[in-house]
């Protein structure tokens, strides 16, 4: 997960092997569930924070390679755009003063990283969508170095077969097309990863879905994109559309997108258990 991809071209045989590998992994996962082989005694969580890099004027700074070299901390990694980086906070056990300790550790890491990034002309900014990002910042040239993101771009467009349509109607309306998935780079977030036991997975999943609206109401911070005022939380629509492999015909047929909120409750960790 997250490793660089060395292969430049994927054959039909590669796709078949990949599908078989996924099925094998699902079979192993199902067996582990049946045999209760998951650790339920050590409850832990992790945190991932995606950030934007800006220059002195507040515009996107295509400088994550230089910034990461200056930061020199393995917890900080690239994200899809050259003006993005992320910090992967090591997992912690849920006990004692863990949240206070987490806050202190994250603040210290971010402050130190920002100080070092500024040495190469980059400032770290935590915001859902950087208001200054424009179409010129979201092209194929904006991808981070390496093959990982360009391969993702190629595979999404191979499945889709046409440009991405970005259509968001809010206070103002945005209607445009993109020939890469670079608009995804505009969306940054904080992601909490909670380890739960299989028996409690459904309750945690359903609870997360139930409070999603309240979380958005409290934490929405991406009203602007491409100079237009759209949704209070534009990331929802933008991320869904920027990763959509469906052409218009499949949308009309009711095929689900790659990214969405879901539509019903679940009763267990089994992917077939929905109500």
Language model features: what each stretch is:
Residues 1-275:
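Phosphate/nucleotide-binding catalytic core
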